[in-house]
UniProtKB/Swiss-Prot annotation:
GO terms for cellular component: nucleus. This is Pre-mRNA-processing ATP-dependent RNA helicase prp5. GO terms for molecular function: ATP binding; ATP hydrolysis activity; nucleic acid binding; RNA helicase activity. Residues 24-87, 94-153, 165-193, 402-411, 984-1007 have a biased composition (Basic and acidic residues). Belongs to the DEAD box helicase family. DDX46/PRP5 subfamily. Residues 1-240, 344-429, 975-1023 are annotated as: Disordered. ATP binds at A619, K620, T621, G622, S623, G624, K625, T626. PANTHER family: ATP-DEPENDENT RNA HELICASE DBP3.
């Protein structure tokens, strides 16, 4: 509560202080005998001391200035600037600290500082907020009139009169009389209307006599009558604020729209200009101490948006100021009520500018005990105009008429509620027909004007002519009626227990499972497709090569690094670019790039590819394999017609890594501009929307990774791109493409390309097991091998050292120091390979501490980081790069002179590719490998690579090789297979099968192509899997006879399930001892048969005396966590309880996927729904199934959006 004295806090509503703050001098003018003597500690100054002779002249001069401004004050609103001028000149003699307080309060208190004490006695005797407001308002106007006798004991000096005040006063009185006549006519019309409502008067009077309550409504004063001092008398009628609002407002011609402004009559505007505009009504923020303390009626006003909070206390009458339209004040007097009357709590009130609030309607059955509180809730609230509230009798008659209309409306709604079909057709809501009166009593409606039909509803009802028009214009919020869920569990109007059918649960679980599965593309039937013919053969052998004999061709291949070919009709290798049959534009680009002569692989591969043959090319790293398949592709594409709208690419290049795809795309760019071609690089990690936009614009060449290509083919139902025009396919690093998880994706893409395509495979390594797999997608291929299938280039110096783990980092620093100590290697690059992502980040941190600028790259980083890191490394921004094997293929850096295998590679091909990052295009390089004593398994492949490249194997490495081979002979170790396939396609197949079985058990995917064993297993456990998805509603008696645990019997797979009552002990049980023994034995067998098993419809503890008449169970153990949370959190359960009146209990224990409860253990987590009617249980189950569906779909969606995690930790 606000403090007394010179506090800055405003006075509370209803206090005897003015709502505006006073200066200290004004407060001192009051005598100590006034009612609010809380400031009695201040000294009082009499008028004689205040207006003594020495300052009387100045006072009169100031009054004359006030009189000169009276005309402006009457015609226009008060101007704060004018008041500030006059008030600033008048200062209190008190120079205390309240000067700031006095200055700040002047904008909020417009009472003139020149008024005398003429009305002081009147304010002292009459504590009415309305009279105090009017006396302050008319203080300055009556200052110049003849002085009146005062009730105060001390006289004051009379003020000079102004000649124009009488005329203005007469004019205002004339306007007032005209306004009164208009209001009198309005009241007579309302009385005639109220007379028609006399039928309900007797009923309501009888209710009033029974209740013994007499709430009173004060008649609002005429806002422009300053002399009215009558206190309204209470009446013995119902307090109906709706009727007050309706009577106070002008006769409505159109429905009032919430939030619009209400026009103020001209007479009200005239009086508003001279009334108090800053008499604030402070909202009472004190909460009720108990239910019998107070009730609140919030009366919002329109233009000035001040919320009046009228508080009705049980012990005293507190008077409040209600501001509205600046028309003065209104007295609201409330009669005393008994302390037993309960009040209606409306919660925390939030007052907002230019917003009207609506309050809920209390339950109707409480009307006898709480008549005043029920009527205090504003049910149908129009915009308020506080001009005239009428007399008490008129208000009472209007209240009774409104109550009669409300009674008729509720009766008609109760009749409609009895018809279930009509209710379903009109609103689609589920009616609780068992307790219609209770449902209606809990209904809370918020309408703008209940008795008036909304124009839109009326128009729609005229069109339909089947449903009666709804008499609501605002939003309706009901407790008893909950929105009917969508008809996803059977027929829309079916009310039986088909709510938990099999097919619908399978539908949304299948949707969730589909979201988790990878995108799939359909298999194309090539026999039904009509493909355009295309030409493969573009190569014409030059005459000098045609005259060459086979012996001369073999000698030439031997000179070109020992080219080995295998196949039928292999073309002879070319010696110059001009012999390849290329176009002028291509030759110009080759010349600009500085390619003088073809490399070994290029001289043999280009003629073979341009002859239209499938080719397998194996060559050492850095030998120019990329140009070997790009140049024939450009010639191949240029021979075909241009692309049309929505046609896919002609050339498709697939790579295993994103970095390699980026590098191939970069190598294409010099040729694209010259040949007027377009290429798109599509790889994972980059935004797919950009790649889709480029593909829709059209591209003859697509460089991609297999996973992203499948995504693009499946995007937008295959409308983004297609493979119908693909005739040239390249698999770069082909051994890796057919390894591990790449093989299914690659074969899926290859199956959708026309069979007569031309396929080219290139790699630096090609194990024999991968070779057999790759040949399945080729047709009579030519195999070209240059320098061995898995051989390190002879330009690379290989160093292998056997070291302990703790000495490797020191040795690495020594190698880097030796490299950069030579000025010639100032621009050299160093690439360090590790085996794990964590090791890459750890080594990065250690090298940074030692002063080496470096970066790391691995599969756990974002693609944009990987791309920028490689670009910076090539540009020389940092000289050292730490990487996993993700950078072992395709990375081409010309200044790379040192490769360090900090962690030894685990097979030969990985070692060849790592070492091949240096010594490219004829340059020299160094590859250093660290081996530890525990890595003797890897020493075999490293020694083999050294021997194949013609280098000596170090003695410590040879000892490790011999030791490992002896262990293999003794059976203690197993020799590792060559190639990346060492991790095993079989292992991945087993993991995929295991994941598929888990999904099948959990979600019942029902995938096709299952083997016989899976089919038999599915047939044996069909009922058990069905019970994991949805619960059935089944009686305890019927379920007790189930002989086999875990396999419920009597379940209709068509979804027609019946709800039975919970088993009750029969009243007239037989007293035969043998019957009792037999019943006990049967009960024991039934309990033993279901020990630890949760079957649908049979909760273990549903036999108690408090068990509902009907029940159902819903197992949620195997659903995702989000789905379980959706049906068990307090908020959702509370909503279902309020809507259906059932009891919902979470029972059982949670078991992870694949784990079943043992004997004597709790069943799996489930929900027990109990209710007194079948309809209540059904509605609760439908809502729970809906929440379960939403949670399952949300969990699947979040899993699909989750980023792929890596094997490293952010430090």
């Amino acid at each position: 509560m606000a403090r007394h004295g010179d506090t800055r806090s405003p006075s509370p509503v209803g206090s005897t202080y003015s709502s505006s703050r006073r200066s200290r001098r004004d407060d001192d003018r009051y005598e100590k005998s006034r009612r609010d003597d809380l400031r009695s500690y201040r000294r009082s100054r009499s008028p004689e001391r205040r207006y003594r002779d020495r300052d009387r002249d100045s006072y009169r001069r100031r009054d004359r200035s006030v009189d000169r401004r009276d005309d402006h004050r009457d015609e226009d609103s008060y101007r704060s600037s004018r008041r500030d001028r006059s008030r600033d000149r008048r200062r209190s003699r008190d120079r205390g600290d309240d000067r700031d307080h006095r200055r700040k309060s002047r904008e909020r208190d417009y009472r003139s500082r020149r008024d005398d004490s003429r009305d002081r006695a009147r304010r002292r005797t009459d504590d009415s907020a309305d009279l105090k407001h009017k006396s302050r308002r008319d203080d300055s106007r009556t200052r110049n009139l003849d002085s009146k006798p005062r009730e105060a004991s001390k006289p004051s000096t009379p003020a000079p009169t102004a000649p124009t005040e009488d005329e203005k006063r007469a004019e205002r009185l004339a306007k007032l009389e005209a306004w009164k006549q208009k209001q009198a006519a309005e009241r007579e019309r309302k009385q005639r209307e109220a007379a028609a409502a006399g039928g309900a008067r007797s009923i309501l009077e009888e209710i009033d006599r029974k209740s013994g309550l007499s709430p009173a409504v004060g008649s609002p004063q005429s806002p422009a009558t300053p002399t009215t001092d009558a206190t309204p008398t209470p009446y013995s009628g119902k307090f109906d604020p709706k009727a007050i609002v309706r009577n106070a407002a002008p006769a409505p011609s159109t429905p009032a729209v919430l939030g619009n402004d209400v026009a103020v009559p001209q007479s009200a505007k005239a009086s508003a200009s001279s009334s108090s505009m800053n008499n604030h009504v402070q909202a009472n923020k004190h909460p009720a101490a108990n239910s019998t303390t107070s009730c609140k009626l919030y009366i919002p006003t329109i233009r000035f948006l001040q919320i009046a909070n009228v508080t009705c206390t049980a012990t005293s009458t507190v008077k409040r100021n209600v501001g509205g339209f600046g028309l003065g004040a209104k007295q609201v007097a409330d009669a005393e009520k008994s302390s037993a009357v309960k009040t209606l709590g409306f919660g925390e009130e939030e007052s907002k500018r230019k917003k009207l609030e609506r309050l809920p309607t209390p339950p109707l059955e409480d009307a006898k005990d709480d008549m005043g509180a029920v009527d205090a809730a504003v049910e149908d609230e129009d915009d308020v105009d506080m001009q005239d509230g009428g007399t008490e009798e008129e208000n009472a008659a209007a209240a009774r008429a409104a109550a009669e209309r409300r009674e008729e409306r509720l009766q008609s709604e109760a009749l409609r509620a009895q018809s279930k079909e009509a209710a379903l057709q009109s609103n689609g809501d589920v009616e609780m027909n068992d307790v219609p009166h209770q449902a209606e009593s809990e209904k809370m409606e918020v309408d703008a004007a209940e008795e008036e039909v909304d124009p839109l509803d009326a128009f729609m009802s005229e069109l339909a002519e089947t449903a009666p028009p709804k008499k609501t214009t605002g939003a309706r919020f009901t407790k008893a009626k909950d929105q009917q869920p969508e008809a996803m569990f059977g027929d829309e109007h079916d009310v039986d227990l088909t709510a938990v059918g099999e097919g619908d649960a399978d539908d949304f679980l299948a949707i969730a499972n589909k979201a988790k599965k990878k995108k799939d593309i359909p298999t194309v039937d090539h026999e039904k497709m009509e493909y355009e013919p295309f030409r493969k053969k573009f190569y014409t052998e030059p005459s000098n090569l045609a005259e060459m004999t086979d012996e001369e061709a073999a000698s030439l291949r031997l000179e070109l690094d020992g080219i080995k070919v295998r196949g039928v009709d292999v073309p002879k290798p070319v010696m110059k670019w001009s012999q390849c049959g290329l176009g002028v534009q291509t030759l110009d680009v080759i010349q600009k790039l500085g390619y003088e002569n073809p490399t070994s692989i290029q001289s043999q591969a280009i003629p073979a590819i341009m002859s239209g043959r499938d080719v397998i090319g194996v060559a050492k790293t850095g030998s120019g394999k990329t140009i070997a398949f790009l140049i024939p592709m450009f010639r191949h594409i240029r021979d075909q017609r241009p692309l049309e709208n929505m046609e896919g690419p002609i050339g498709l290049i697939m790579t295993p890594t994103r970095e390699l795809a980026t590098q191939i795309h970069k190598d294409c760019k010099p040729f694209l501009k010259a040949l007027n071609l377009r290429a798109v690089c599509a790889y994972g990690g980059a935004p797919i929307k950009d790649q889709i936009a480029e593909l829709k614009r059209g591209a003859e060449i697509v460089v991609c990774t297999p996973g992203r290509m499948i995504d693009l083919l499946a995007a937008n139902a295959g409308r983004v791109t297609n493979l119908r025009r693909v005739t040239y396919v390249v698999l770069d690093e082909a051994d890796r493409m057919f390894d591990m998880g790449f093989e299914p994706q690659v074969m899926k893409i290859m199956a959708n390309i026309r069979p007569d395509r031309q396929t080219v495979l290139f790699s630096a390594t090609f194990p024999r097991n991968m070779e057999a797999l790759a040949r399945k997608s080729l047709t009579k291929p030519i195999e070209i091998v240059v320098g061995g299938k898995s051989v390190v280039a002879p330009e690379i110096t290989q160093i292998v050292e056997v070291r302990n783990e703790d000495t490797k980092f020191v040795r690495l620093l020594e190698i880097l120091g030796n490299l950069y100590s030579d000025d010639a290697n100032e621009d050299a690059r160093a690439l360090i390979f590790v085996d794990r992502q964590e090791a890459a980040d750890t080594l990065l941190r250690e090298l940074m501490r030692k002063g080496y600028p470096c970066m790391s790259i691995h599969g756990g980083k974002d693609q944009i980081d990987r791309d920028s890191t490689i670009e910076d490394f090539k540009a020389g921004i940092f000289p050292v790069l730490i990487a996993t094997s993700v950078a072992a293929r395709g990375l081409d850096v010309k200044q790379l002179k040192l490769v360090v295998n900090y962690d030894a590679p685990n097979h030969l091909e990985d070692y060849v590719h790592r070492a091949g990052r240096t010594g490219r295009a004829g340059n020299t390089g160094t590859a250093v490998t660290f081996l530890t004593e525990e890595q003797e398994r890897y020493s075999v492949d490293i020694a083999k690579a050294l021997r194949q490249s013609g280098q000596k194997v170090p003695e410590p490495v040879q000892k490790m090789v011999d030791s490992f081979l002896e262990k293999v002979k003794a059976g203690k170790e197993k020799a590792s297979a060559s190639g990346f396939g060492g991790k095993g396609l079989e292992r991945l197949d087993q993991e995929r099968d295991a994941a598929r079985m888990r999904e099948r058990r959990t979600y019942k995917t029902g995938e096709e192509g299952e083997d016989e064993e899976d089919k038999e297993d599915k047939a044996e456990k069909a009922d058990e899997r069905f019970s994991k998805i949805v619960s059935s509603v089944q009686s305890a008696a019927a379920a007790a006879t189930t002989p086999l645990p875990g396999v419920p019997k009597g379940i209709d797979l068509d979804g027609k399930i019946t709800v039975h009552r919970t088993e009750k002990d029969p009243a007239g049980a037989s007293k035969n001892p043998l019957d009792k023994v037999g019943s006990a034995v049967a009960d024991i067998h039934a309990r033993l048969s279901r020990a630890g098993v949760m079957r649908s419809g049979v909760p273990i503890d549903n036999r108690g005396p408090d068990a509902g008449a009907f029940h159902a169970t819903l197992e949620i153990n195997d659903f995702p966590q989000k789905a379980r949370w959706a049906v068990t959190n307090r908020t959702n359960v509370a909503k279902i309880l309020e809507a259906t009146g059932t009891s919902i209990t979470t029972k059982g224990s949670f078991y992870p996927a694949g784990k079943e409860p043992g004997p004597g253990e709790n069943p799996k987590l489930y929900i027990l729904v109990e209710g007194e009617t079948e309809l209540a249980v059904t509605n609760a189950m439908r809502e729970l199934m809906r929440l379960l569906k939403e949670g399952t779909l949300a969990a699947a969606d979040s899993d699909a959006r989750a980023p792929v995690g890596g094997r490293y930790n952010v430090v």
